[in-house]
Amino acid sequence: NTNIVDVYKTATQKTDISVDDLSSDYFNGNNYNTNLYPNAIDPAIFYDKDGGMWMAYGSWSGGIYLLELDPATGQAIHPTASAKDGNVITDIYFGKKIAGGYGQSGEGPYVIYDKDTGYYYLYMSYGYLTANQGYNIRMFRSENPDGPYVDAAGKEATWGSSGHNGIGVKVLGSYNLPCLAYKYMAPGHNSALIDDDKMFLV
């Protein structure tokens, strides 16, 4: 467990910080600001090409965030300052937003590095767990573990429009084939595996 005030004290090297000193963006009135900051679910840990350890996590309206981890302890290495650059938020406590948010769907992140292409691939599930317009898996890529992640058209995964229908490479969605006894509905929350000369979507 981490105490947000303690994280702020460590990051800023100030000892006189209280809850009142935290970012006002964390709140929307008396409620947590779910459009800007993540739900603490769906963690996925990966290693970068140099052995660095990272955790992508979060879901739905607040987007996907990334924290670097200490490989020896598994503890988060929090950013030392907060910043905002367009739709990319870097937060002392939550880490760096790499995708989604702004009230739109997007969850179940999974990041994998492919040494042959030199890219990190981010998979995410968009949509809902429903039969109509259910989950679909989309992919983005980046040359760096912390982004920016973009699709084939160059659109960033942090694109903050009123909808996310126009971004990401759609890898898989609901489908029905005449030879199948059942329809496949709302595939999502995938992982991926590279084994020798083969790649697998799990």
Predicted regions span which residues?
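Carbohydrate-active catalytic/glycan-binding domains of CAZyme proteins
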Residues: 1-202
